[in-house]
């Protein structure tokens, strides 16, 4: 957002008779590692989508229900002033003298409007499909968003527009302008169709205006002549007569004047010029909430009434998406509980993270690493930052933003705030002690022997450790239970399958469920060059189940297709491709375990394993829910946890195999569909995502899943395969080699599938299906192509 400002940086320790509620959770992020600074955001009024704009001109659109970004494209704005998102897919971008309206689904510009003067204020009415901008020299222009045309242009002949608000009836608009020298000006209520002045308020310096839901009141913020006092005032929505004043503060105190806001349920939600978000009670008076969370108040830059709102309702949930600081962390405010209940971080690349006030998290691996809880008041001497990934095992929650929106007041109040100081004080801290008995300066060491030993020291809170885990080249290689001691020794086997450097990190789990910060180190292995790797390829496809009502349409064809294309495109990478083809009635637990056990005994560190499964996938229904893939002889998917335990293959089973198999390049691809008629398919899908994501991170392996979509025969008729596997086969066949270097890496493949499957499913089924890819391991090639 661009604003005209006068600099007024003042610090004061102002006390108040009654302090408002404050945001108790503190988040930070590694700004030097972000791709681009966020410069704008908006949410559709129905709460289904949110859009974010970045300094590098990228715009991304987030699907709240799906819990992921579904669109990213580049625009032409240079200095974004405001943005709005409509329910019918229009994105409105405002800067300088330009308004651009884009259909974000097609990325096409629908129209552009050019104003005479620079835009200083804008406002949007979803109810009436109207948009308006105020400009320098008092000009106002109103647009019909349905017809994409100008309705009227008129001028308040005084100065720059400083406040602008549509009346809920869509026929009138309130306009205020900045004072010229000492001359104050009234707010005018103007008829949009004619431009006629209907009524004026008393004179003042107005920086914000917002009608309540019925148009009975107009809430405004104003400054006095000497710019030393800011007030919130309630005007009659028809006569603009002053009804009452809500709040008055000296400008260098806790809260200076709002320059943007909206009224909801008797509250004014305002973004202030002190770069805070405040909630004012317009009935009882006073400030109910502020994001200013400490006694030292830094006012920052005082706006002269030029700026725009960054608070958007998320449908009828009572939650609002806000951004007062102008950085990459957005907040979710709940008006019913009067609290920040969540946070949303995003970057212009693929990264995003969602955080709830009770410590639940969701997001991409890089975002969960870059965003952290922090506290300047902790007693700890080190490890001040606790990245979100530290709570992945205990707190990962797919589609978290949707959950936060759906949680009612009772549920929200029952949630406990994540108490940063208490948690950070008890997190263990680790340090690399030695490699083969010698100290490793700066976290680096060299070794010629393949079998080596490392020691990890716990430097703080050793009694809190429940286990210490060691990862090699991002794959889990060993877990040692916590014993209260301060030193843990690991026997390791070095490899040059990724080159001479072996990358390690260790982390300690704690009693609080939060992991320590990773201690990272490298060992340069100068031993004997290893033999060319082998590929162990396990493909499982089950069309015919023992219970015929679970039969599928094309699981066998999908498994056959995957086996053929990987064998064809991967041969030159490997000394040998060792296939395990398990189909239909042969696909029982004993046979699948036998194949994986055989690989466990033979695979070396430099080898690769790919496991592909096409069949049913379910969550158990007991208290300890677990994800299962369903072999041929399971005859009841739901309500028989004993049968699943006896004949199914659980996430825990897969985790054990992934950990025990030496191969450090592991890929698991699951096209595990839901059975038709599963009433709680959405909940089951989220639970499966959580189980697989935690499995992927805990083992450091790659997982690509279809997220439990139901199979349809029409997919096979048109594609010859299911949608997910069709995209997979296209990708491995060469379509996913986006940089055209004739080598396909696993990250390139997963990105292609995540983008292609929604496109295909919307074309064939009318609704988008979103696969999930969890890539916590190192990237590596899976196929090569001849020129």
Predicted stretch roles:
Residues 371-787:
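Cysteine endopeptidase catalytic domains of the caspase/legumain-like
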Residues 50, 91-92, 131, 173, ...:
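Hydrophobic beta-strand positions that form the internal "hydrophobic ladder"
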Residues 45-46, 87-88, 126-127, 168-169, ...:
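Residue-level detector of Asp-centered blade-edge/turn motifs that repeat once per structural unit
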Residues 38-40, 79-83, 118-123, 159-164, ...:
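Repeated scaffold domains used in trafficking and secretory/extracellular systems
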């Amino acid at each position: 957002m661009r604003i005209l400002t006068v600099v007024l940086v003042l610090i004061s320790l102002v006390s108040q008779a009654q302090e408002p509620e404050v945001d108790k959770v503190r988040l930070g992020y590694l700004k030097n590692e972000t791709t681009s600074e966020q410069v704008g955001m908006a949410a559709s009024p129905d709460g289904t989508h949110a859009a974010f704009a970045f300094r590098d001109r990228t715009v991304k659109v987030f699907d709240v229900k799906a819990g992921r970004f579904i669109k990213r494209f580049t625009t032409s704005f240079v200095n974004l002033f405001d943005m709005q998102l409509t329910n019918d897919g229009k994105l409105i971008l405002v800067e300088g003298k330009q308004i651009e309206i884009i259909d974000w689904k097609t990325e096409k510009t629908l129209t552009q409007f050019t104003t005479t003067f620079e835009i200083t204020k804008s406002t949007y009415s979803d109810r009436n499909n109207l948009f308006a901008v105020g400009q320098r020299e008092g000009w106002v222009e109103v647009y019909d968003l349905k017809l994409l045309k100008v309705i009227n242009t008129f001028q308040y002949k005084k100065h720059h527009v400083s406040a602008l608000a549509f009346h809920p009836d869509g026929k009138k608009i309130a306009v205020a302008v900045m004072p010229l020298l000492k001359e104050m000006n009234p707010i005018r209520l103007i008829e949009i169709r004619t431009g006629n002045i209907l009524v004026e308020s008393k004179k003042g310096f107005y920086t914000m205006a917002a009608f309540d839901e019925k148009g009975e009141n107009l809430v405004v913020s104003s400054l006095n002549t000497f710019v030393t006092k800011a007030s919130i005032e309630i005007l009659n929505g028809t006569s603009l007569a002053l009804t009452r004043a809500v709040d008055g503060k000296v400008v260098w105190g806790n809260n200076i004047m709002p320059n943007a806001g909206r009224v909801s349920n008797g509250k004014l939600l305002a973004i202030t010029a002190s770069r805070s978000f405040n909630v004012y009670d317009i009935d009882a008076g006073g400030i109910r909430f502020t994001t200013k969370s400490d006694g030292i108040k830094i006012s920052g830059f005082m706006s002269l009434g030029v700026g725009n709102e960054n608070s958007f309702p998320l449908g009828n949930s009572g939650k609002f998406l806000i951004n007062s600081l102008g950085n990459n962390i957005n907040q979710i405010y709940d008006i019913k509980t009067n609290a920040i209940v969540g946070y949303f971080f995003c970057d212009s690349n693929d990264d995003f993270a969602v955080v709830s006030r009770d410590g639940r998290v969701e997001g991409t691996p890089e975002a969960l690493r870059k965003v952290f809880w922090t506290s300047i008041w902790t007693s700890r001497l080190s490890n001040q930052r606790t990245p979100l990934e530290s709570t992945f095992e205990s707190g990962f929650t797919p589609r978290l933003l949707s959950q936060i929106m759906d949680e009612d007041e009772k549920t929200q109040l029952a949630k406990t705030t994540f108490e940063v100081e208490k948690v950070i004080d008890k997190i263990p801290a680790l340090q690399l002690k030695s490699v083969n008995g010698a100290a490793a300066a700066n976290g680096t060491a060299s070794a010629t022997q393949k079998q080596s030993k490392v020691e990890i020291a716990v430097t703080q809170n050793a009694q809190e450790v429940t286990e210490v885990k060691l990862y090699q080249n991002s794959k889990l290689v060993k877990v040692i239970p916590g014993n209260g001691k301060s030193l843990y020794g690991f026997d390791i086997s070095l490899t040059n399958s990724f080159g001479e450097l072996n990358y390690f990190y260790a982390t300690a789990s704690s009693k609080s469920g939060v992991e320590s910060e990773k201690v990272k180190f490298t060992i340069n292995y100068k031993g004997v060059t290893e033999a060319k790797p082998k590929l162990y390829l396990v493909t499982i496809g089950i069309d015919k189940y023992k219970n015929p009502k679970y039969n599928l349409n094309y699981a066998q064809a999908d498994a056959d297709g995957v086996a053929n294309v990987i064998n064809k495109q991967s041969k030159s990478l490997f000394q040998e491709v060792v296939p395990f083809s398990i189909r239909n009635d042969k696909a029982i637990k004993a046979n699948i375990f036998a194949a994986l056990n055989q690989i466990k005994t033979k695979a070396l560190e430099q080898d690769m394993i790919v496991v592909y499964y096409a069949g049913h996938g379910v969550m158990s229904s007991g208290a300890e829910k677990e994800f299962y893939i369903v072999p041929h002889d399971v005859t009841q998917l739901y309500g028989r946890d004993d049968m699943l335990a006896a004949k199914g293959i659980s996430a825990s089973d897969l985790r054990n195999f992934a950990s025990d198999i030496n191969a450090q390049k592991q890929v698991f691809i699951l096209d595990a569909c839901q059975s038709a008629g599963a009433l709680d398919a959405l909940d089951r899908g989220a639970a499966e995502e959580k189980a697989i994501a935690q499995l992927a991170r805990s083992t450091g392996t790659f997982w690509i899943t279809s997220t439990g979509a139901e199979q349809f025969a029409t997919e096979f008729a048109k594609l010859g395969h299911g949608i997910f596997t069709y995209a997979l086969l296209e990708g491995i066949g060469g379509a996913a080699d986006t940089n055209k270097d004739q080598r396909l890496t696993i990250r390139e493949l997963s990105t292609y599938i995540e983008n292609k499957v929604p496109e295909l499913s919307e074309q064939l089924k009318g609704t988008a299906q979103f696969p999930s890819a969890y890539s916590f391991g190192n990237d590596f090639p899976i196929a090569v192509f001849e020129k």
